[in-house]
């Protein structure tokens, strides 16, 4: 039987759509299947896009892309139950933007359609179609759609890939649950509250006592007329906790360092999303095969650097490697096992460099000291530095030495040594 197209891609998220666009640009016929009626309506991310990979895909993206604000203000806050120590910086030349996936994804799909991609929203893929051990299409209801190659870009919850035995379910330690809320706030209030002007944006990251005693982090990004607020906590830790995930977000919003930032806001959106932040060691051993390959969150290519989570830009970078693989494979008449070529292209990409660079960070972030001891230490030191009571402030070295010993010098030293080895 003849193929319906060269490439079928399951999932019109950032990775799937970018891969489709590149393949179509090279002259391949591409069918992009999306289960949502509107692309982006089922996609959730923190909301910060590093645009280097987008610029390679669409050099003139800034003319039409629905970007929110250019991130120029950065801060990292270490929270204790009732206090905070914050490190902040101003970077006017930053090349990252806040985005809302409900607006960004439809735009990216439209750009892909301009290159000839056929996108079918509201399409449910029930199974992969296989012949003689090779994936050569998909089954949608009573219909079989055939293609030379199939790309699985179905997200972190890779139901089809797991059902067909292409990958195994990831360990709980390798997955996190992100809970996000979009809050409405007038533009003038956002710019006044976060000290912004001229379409500037702020990225506020939080660590410490966010998810009670659980490891985790949180974020707040400014958009044009909304705030993106959320927490991220390891799935394995959540399953051991008796606190519902939604309650953790509620407690975070009530923290004295967060509450003033979100006052007089109204909730517009709320959702949860699995985040594959296990890094290099959580990637599937075999992420491509006879007629198929994985891309995006299905590839588990999200990278937690410790102070940021790089998801969307890594999805775009991985999509480039996937498209290169498919374009090369389609030049051969006989079907190809995609893994050798795909692995070669991934290893030559920025994605692989970043994955290797931060491969030990997930294990490092499991150490409880980062969430308990270090925030408390920084708060104690800063409090004593600013204390102007009736007693003279002790020498700085004496102050540091006192608090280091009180919080456990050797445990702190162990954290530092492991960090230096990892980073």
Curated annotation (Swiss-Prot):
Entry annotated with the keyword RNA-binding: no
Residues bound to FAD: 7-21
UniProt KW keywords: FAD, Flavoprotein, Oxidoreductase
Gene Ontology MF: a single term: oxidoreductase activity
Keyword Coiled coil carried by entry: no
GO CC list: plasma membrane
InterPro entries per record: ETF-QO/FixC_UQ-bd, FAD-dep_OxRdtase, FAD/NAD-bd_sf, FixC-like
A Pfam family recorded for this sequence: DAO
EC number in record: 1.5.5.-
Cofactor: FAD
Family listed: Belongs to the ETF-QO/FixC family.
Function according to Swiss-Prot or TrEMBL: Probably accepts electrons from YgcQ/YgcR and reduces a quinone.
Protein name stated in the entry: Probable electron transfer flavoprotein-quinone oxidoreductase YgcN
Gene name linked to the record: ygcN
């Amino acid at each position: 039987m003849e193929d319906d197209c060269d490439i079928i891609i399951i999932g019109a998220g950032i990775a799937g759509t970018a891969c489709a666009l590149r393949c179509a640009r090279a002259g391949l016929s591409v069918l992009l299947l999306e289960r949502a009626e509107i692309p982006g309506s089922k996609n959730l991310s923190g909301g910060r896009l590093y645009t280097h990979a987008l610029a390679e895909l669409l050099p003139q993206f800034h003319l039409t892309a629905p970007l929110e604000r250019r991130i120029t203000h950065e801060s990292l806050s270490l929270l204790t139950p009732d206090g905070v120590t914050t490190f902040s910086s101003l970077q006017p030349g930053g090349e990252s933007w806040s985005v809302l996936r409900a607006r960004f994804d439809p735009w990216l799909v439209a750009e892909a359609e301009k290159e000839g991609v056929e996108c079918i929203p509201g399409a449910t893929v029930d199974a992969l179609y296989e012949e003689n051990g090779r994936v050569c299409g998909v089954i949608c209801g009573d219909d079989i759609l055939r293609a030379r190659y199939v790309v699985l870009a179905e997200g972190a919850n890779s139901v089809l890939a797991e059902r067909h035995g292409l990958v195994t379910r990831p360990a709980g330690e390798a997955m996190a649950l992100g809970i996000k809320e979009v809050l409405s706030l007038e533009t003038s209030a956002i710019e006044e509250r976060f000290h912004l002007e001229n379409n500037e944006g702020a990225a506020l990251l939080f660590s410490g006592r966010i998810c009670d005693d659980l490891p985790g982090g949180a974020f707040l990004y400014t958009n044009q007329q909304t705030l993106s607020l959320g927490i991220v906590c390891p799935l394995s830790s959540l399953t051991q906790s008796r606190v519902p995930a939604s309650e953790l977000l509620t407690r975070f919003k009530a923290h004295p360092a967060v509450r003033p930032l979100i006052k007089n806001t109204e909730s517009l959106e709320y959702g949860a999303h699995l985040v594959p932040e296990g890094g290099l060691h959580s990637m599937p051993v075999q992420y491509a095969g006879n007629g198929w390959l994985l891309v995006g969150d299905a590839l588990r290519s999200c990278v937690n650097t410790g102070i940021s989570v790089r998801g969307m830009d890594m999805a775009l970078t991985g999509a480039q490697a996937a498209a290169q693989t498919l374009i090369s494979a389609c030049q051969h008449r006989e079907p190809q096992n995609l893994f050798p070529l795909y692995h070669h292209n991934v290893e030559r990409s920025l994605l692989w460099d970043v994955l290797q660079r931060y491969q030990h960070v997930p294990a490092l972030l499991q150490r409880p000291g980062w969430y308990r001891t270090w925030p408390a230490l920084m708060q104690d030191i800063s409090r004593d530095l600013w204390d102007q009571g009736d007693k003279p402030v002790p020498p700085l070295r004496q102050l540091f030495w006192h608090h280091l010993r009180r919080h456990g010098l050797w445990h702190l030293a162990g954290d530092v040594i492991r960090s230096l080895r990892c980073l």
